[in-house]
Amino acid sequence: MKYVDEYREGDAARRIAAEIGHEADPKRIYRFMEFCGGHTHVLARWGLTDILPPNVRMIHGPGCPVCELPVARIDMAMQLALERNVILCTYADTMRVPAGKGMSLFKAKAQGADIRMIYSPMDALELAKANPEREVVFFAIGFETTTPPTAVVLKAAKAAGVKNFSVFCNHVLTPAAMTHILKMSEERPEVPVLDGLVGP
């Protein structure tokens, strides 16, 4: 498979590792921070940190917005679903995040809360249209790159005159986190590793 099999070419990996070792000044320590949990997963899955010279260090950054979400936000979402009888729509990766009192959205669903896993904010809007007698709340989460779909669904709801749809907005901004890390951390990275999804 293109761009998968290439990762398994041992000769190419050894050549690249040797080039990195040759370029890295042994008198200097290099610190790179991967920002997103997806980056961390790729580095670990393919063993990339194991081939780096000892003076080239990867620092795990803030991670995923789901993992950074304050417990109180999950508690608030559960309260909406359990006590206000709303249809709470969320992405699958939020379902098992631990919340207060040993709860999670998954456990709240097991207790009778109407929590639905969706793939797109538009799925939540369609649920609202199909259930006009119920309030449908989209539990919006993600880095700032996920805010446009949230904005689009709100605009679509307004244009369609849907009155039983709302958003519990929990988007996370990356610049504040990076600024804090770059200013305050003793082991701060020289280079944060960003991509087109997260970062400039």
Please give the residue ranges for each predicted region.
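Structural motif
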Residues: I87, E135-V137, V191
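Catalytic alpha/beta core domains of metabolic enzymes, predominantly
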Residues: N170-P200
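Metallocofactor- and cofactor-centric catalytic cores in central/energy metabolism, strongly enriched
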Residues: M1-E133, T147, K155-A160, S166-F168, ...
